[in-house]
Each structure stands twice: as C-alpha cells, then as structure tokens.
C-alpha cells in the first residue's frame, strides 16, 4: 500500500492564450532550475488559475495552495476540481462553524471557557486532504491560513491506520478493538462518519473522510475473505478491492504507550508548576491548576480525550518546550510545491497568527488556568513557516514589497485571453460627486450591469446606500458588521440583479469574480491610508476588469502618489492589452459566469433563498426543516432495507439542497 504515482491530468478544451503560454513556460523553467521563490504578477481576469493549473500538471508535484479566507479557498477548490477530475483535489479550512477561544481577563477576574461548534462536513474534507497527501502524489490541497495550526503528528496518523487486505489473518474482535482505539464508534442504526456496525461475520465501516460509501469487511473464521466498497444509501456494490486503509477518526490520536508516557510528563510538569505558584504565595492559582489538570488527566486515562486536549499536544507529539507544532505542511513530502494566492493579503495573515494566539494564552498560563505547555499549542511562527517551504510561487495582481524582494524572478501576466482591457480610470472632483454618481449608475443600469461604491467609513456607506435608494437605485451597503452569511447573500443578489449597487468600505478587493460589475466608484480617493494605498486602488479598480464597459471613477480634489502610481500602472496594462488585441485581431468580450458558481460550498452551512420555493414552503427555514425531516425518513427506509424508497427521498433532498445553493 505505497504512495500512488499517478500523474496529474488536466482536463479542458481551453488552450493557454494571451500571456498565459509565456507565463507557464517561464514559471516551469524557474521551477526546474531549482528557483525557490518566484512571483506571478497577474492582472485581474488574466486567467491566473488556469496558468497555475498548467504549471501543476506539467511540474507534477504534490501542491499546496494557500489563500487568506474560506470563500476564496472554496472558489479555487471548485475550479481545480473541474480542471483535474481524475486527481485528488482537496479542501482544508478551519472546521469551526462557531469558535469562542478560551480566555482570561484578569482586570475583571473573568474566565471565558472555550465554546465551539464543529462542522462535520469540513472535518471530513480535512481528513480527505491528509489521507490524499499521505497516499498519493497527484494531489492539490487548497487551504486557508488555518493550515499553519497544529494538526497532530503525521507519523501517528499514518502508522496507526488499519491496513486491511484480502486473505490476511485477522480476528474480528481484534479489528473492533482497533477501530475503537482509532476513535471510531459503534453505530448499528445510522450511517455517520467514523462509525462501524457489526452483523455476524460482517463489519461495515464508515471512514473518517466520507459518508458517500462504507467499507464492508467479510470474515471467514479469522481471515478477511472479502473487502467491498458500497454505496452508503442504496447498498449497491461500487467495487471489490484487495486492500483498504482505515485512518484514525481524529488527527490527534496517539498510540497507547505514548499516551501513558504523556500523562506521566503532564503530572510531573503539574507538580513543578504548583510548587512554583505556592513559592510565590499564589495558593488560588496553585489549587485551580491542580484541580483542572488532574481532572483532564483522569478523563484522558479513562476516555482517551478531554475538553481542551489540544493544550497537551506537545506531550503526545513528543515535542520539547518551544518546538513548533506539526501542521498540514508536515504531511506533505519534501519536494512539494507551495502556491500563495493573493500573497499581498495572505502573507500578512500568516505573519500575524502567532502573536495574536500567544498573547491570549499567556494570561491563561500566568493565572493558573493552563500549564505552560498550552503555549506550544499554537500556529507556526512566520519564520517556521518559511523553513518548511521547498519551492513557492507568490501570486497577486499587486504583490507586496516583501515577496518582490525575496523572489528570484517576477513573471508578468498582463494580457487577458478575452481581450478585455483594464478599466478606464477617471478622476473627478468631489463637488457634486453624489449627483454625478447617480447619473453614472443610471447608465450602468440601462446596460443591465452593476456597480460598486467604496467609501471611507461605515456610516458614509449606509448614508450613500440610503441616498441611492431614495433615487430609485436598488442599493445595499456591506461592511464588517455583516456576518459572512449576509455578505454571501449580498454578493449573490448583486450578481443576479436583485440589486444594482453595493456600497461598502473594503469591498471584495481580492479574488471573487463579479463579471456583471462595470463601474467602480471610489469616494475620497485622495484620503491617504491603507484603504487608498497603491495596492488597494489597483485591486479595487480591478473589480471592473471583467466587463467590456469597465470603468473606475476616483472622486478626489488632488492626486496622491498612490493614485498617480495606480493610474499609470492601469494605463500601462491597458496599452499592453490594446497592442496585443491589435496584433492578433482580438475583439474584447465580457466574461460570462453562471451565478451558481459563486457560492456553492464557501460556507457549508450558509444558505440563500431560492427564487421559486417548493409548494407548501414559505421560507428558507421551512426548506431546512423539510430537508431534516426527509433525511430522517431516508435513513429509516435504508435501515429497513427499503432502498428504492430511500433513493427517491435522497433525490428529493438533493433538489431542495440545490435550491439553497448547497448541492
């Protein structure tokens, strides 16, 4: 059961065009020469993802793509999945739907207990990613910055797997014990991730990374007679296999001897820390730490886990104090390729993770809520992250100075295959700017296109949205106080045409495709600061670069250095594209992209109301209740072996989920 050597197969009818062939060739040349760090400077709409897909296919190395948020990760995951249907394309983001970290505020003597809700679907994706990385080389993992957080020792995860093979001697009871040790639970009634059921000489296992199929293991005496992968719902045989690896139900599982040794070390460190608190005359902290830690030790000894077990991860991993945690990067082979997308945003996030985490935990340790080992349950420091890089491509329309200084090569991708030019940029005075804005948006409306308006404050965003609404323009505002569900719904409304304009402070500068947007209006463009920096202006102007009528209006009474640089760069890119179009006889065309592509799995618990609701259903909440009811009905049929009825109900559930964008 070695690592699969299957090659990447890029499936597409498209051929590289514009600057793509040149960029692909140069990036590959650099990689093959051993260049460690390089940058792909690709303008919005130039097809950077397609370029990267070609590089991945030709270079043929396991690849990790890191982006700065879940929505962009999901968009890239979906695009790579379509381009590489025969290869392992995986999605690795934080599995929390809700997360309130443990904290202590000494000024108020207030302890906040950790509270979290884990999304089982995202947890399945994470297991699927680590299993693919360990079992095959034709793998692309698209991850958020959560990939630098502790994940458990890869050696334990890999070595503890149960290797099933047809014909091997294996006692059925021993297999059941092993499954329990790996964190699997017996469940003879429902099909759930990381469970198993037993009927006579047959064990059925639902793996940790999927609920689509189950593994049926048939015994004859003490021998594995047959291993079959079956459809989890209708129990049809998918295929019979010679071997199958069952991986642990958690990334944090450790062998029993390791656990026993870890508990001894925890107790030893506890005694020393309690002694230290007492020597400082801090009896309350000493007593608190002793009681809490001894309770955790007993829970781990009896049940194999406790609340907040990650705070003891250093002991289970065999790490010394201060040593970095194991992360997703440690699961990859040494020759992996790293791609950091939207690097000007992702790099600062990677830098900031460690300090933010440490300041919170130091208080917990200082006041006796946690042992000092809690400080080692942390994300990687930025320097530690860099040490784990083999070869990296930074990707951005506006790379940061840090990436550019480190890169041995900067590969430009300015020309778009569609022939689309960068938006026309106009600077207009602030006087009567709102009247001018209304006039421009009405022109956009006539063409059935959309607009984005950027302000400098949340209050101004709301006021402008109200002003536009009063003038019969369908406008809504977006700012940081809106949660991700509301933001996702707003984007969908804009793309579908339910609204004409979104007004906001920091509007979707990076990544998301909004081909319907032909106008970007930047209010107070001459106010210097982060939101009006060169990078911010280029990214914002780029939001209108996927439409043939793309235009950016900068309302300002003076031209700042950032504005001047952004305008010059946009004009330079327009000129390059114009010359290319003229030379090759290309007529620019707007990008067309179905709206459904925008928000399918970005947040797996996010929903949006369909235009036409099913009969008897009045709201999105009703649909969710209906799905829940049908799922119970489906499993009831399945348990009674009425698979045809179960399949019909499953199809009905699929239709409802599709309406909600959850398909």
Swiss-Prot record:
Motif Beta-hairpin: positions: 95-118
Gene that this polypeptide is encoded by: uvrB
One Pfam family of this chain: UVR
UniProt function note: The UvrABC repair system catalyzes the recognition and processing of DNA lesions. A damage recognition complex composed of 2 UvrA and 2 UvrB subunits scans DNA for abnormalities. Upon binding of the UvrA(2)B(2) complex to a putative damaged site, the DNA wraps around one UvrB monomer. DNA wrap is dependent on ATP binding by UvrB and probably causes local melting of the DNA helix, facilitating insertion of UvrB beta-hairpin between the DNA strands. Then UvrB probes one DNA strand for the presence of a lesion.
Domains as described in the record: The beta-hairpin motif is involved in DNA binding.
Location(s), subcellular: Cytoplasm
All copies of domain UVR, residue ranges: 624-659
Protein name as annotated: UvrABC system protein B
Domain Helicase ATP-binding: 29-416
Binding site for ATP: 42-49
Alphabetic keyword roster: ATP-binding, Cytoplasm, DNA damage, DNA excision, DNA repair, Excision nuclease, Nucleotide-binding, SOS response
BP GO terms, sorted: nucleotide-excision repair, DNA damage recognition; SOS response
UniProt xrefs under Gene3D superfamilies: P-loop containing nucleotide triphosphate hydrolases, UVR domain
